[in-house]
A protein has these predicted regions:
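Short, solvent-exposed coil/turn linker segments
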Residues: 1, 32-33, 52, 97, ...
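Catalytic donor nucleotide-activated moiety binding site of glycosyltransferases and closely related
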Residues: 3-48
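Hydrophobic anchor at the start of a short beta-strand
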Residues: 12-14, 81, 119
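Glycine-rich loops and low-complexity Gly/Arg-rich segments
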Residues: 39-42, 70-72, 88-91, 105-109
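Active-site regions of enzymes building and remodeling cell-envelope glycoconjugates
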Residues: 40-45, 79-80, 94-102
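A donor-sugar binding/catalytic signature common to diverse glycosyltransferases
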Residues: 49-95
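Leloir-type glycosyltransferase catalytic cores
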Residues: 93-141
Length: 141
């Protein structure tokens, strides 16, 4: 349903990244039958075993998630992010309505970065710059 909705607004290619636990190394069906993807034009299933999340997002114009910790990387990289579930860790800095997919908002992430850092790092790591050094690689230049 989501793919069809997006295709109604753009003809750009869509890449679907399966959870790594859903595919085995030779990309055959494990937990889910992914053959439905073949019914769509210009949609590709990404090999999430051999292609990293970083590689998957390298050319992304936006990223769409239901609720996934993977959405954190797209926000860190400054990729317009869409999440559907309010409990997503990226909810506050994500778009929620796919009708805006061609003109997504990239909100100010400063407070979100602060909140994320405070939730995962010690005060000492903050003082000595570990947090900044860790996230610096993901920030747009």
């Amino acid at each position: 349903k989501t793919i069809k909705f997006i295709q109604g607004r753009t003809d750009e290619p869509i890449k679907v990244r399966a959870h790594p636990g859903d595919l085995n190394r030779d990309r055959t069906k494990t937990k889910h039958d992914w053959s439905w993807i073949n019914a769509y034009h210009n949609v590709e299933l990404i090999d999430s075993i051999n292609v990293t999340l970083h590689q998957s997002m390298k050319t992304a114009r936006c990223a769409v998630f239901y609720n996934s910790s993977s959405s954190v990387l797209s926000v860190l990289k400054g990729i317009p992010t869409f999440v559907a579930e309010e409990s997503a860790v990226t909810w506050d800095v994500a778009n929620h309505n796919l009708k805006t997919i061609m003109h997504p908002v990239v909100p100010d992430r400063t407070q979100w970065f602060n909140d994320l850092a405070q939730a995962h790092w010690t005060l000492e790591q903050s003082r000595n710059g570990d947090i900044y050094r860790h996230f610096e690689q993901y920030l747009p230049t």
